[in-house]
Amino acid sequence: MATYNKIADWAVNSEKTANIGTDTFVLALSNTAPGSESTPPTGDGNGVLANVTQVSYTNCSSRTLTTASSSQTSGTLKLDFNDITLTASGGSVGPFRYIYIYDDTPTSPADPLGGYYDYGSSTTLSAGETL
């Protein structure tokens, strides 16, 4: 089972640069542990996609998320996305262990990270396989 981890910078970025209702959110795949990146994306001020080593997406289906609903209660933002299926086509995708959610719309900071899922071990999607 995957474990969700919030990126601390998202609290600041979501308030200052994100428009939850209209922005485009995308998944990014990585096989590099956040703490092993040359600039860890979990560090203060580093929560952007540029600090994540991504896998090649040549054989991967669309990674764009569709917002199902969002709400805010007592300072807690809840953002729900429709289910998404990633499919490898024409070759493999990965290996990857971490799946980041980032906001693809803001330009400053560009591509702020909301959080990531840690699957506990690396996986590779072979052609025709889905996640």
Question: Where in this protein do the model-derived segments appear?
Answer:
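Small cysteine-rich, disulfide-bonded extracellular modules of the LU/uPAR three-finger superfamily
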Residues: 1-97, 104-131
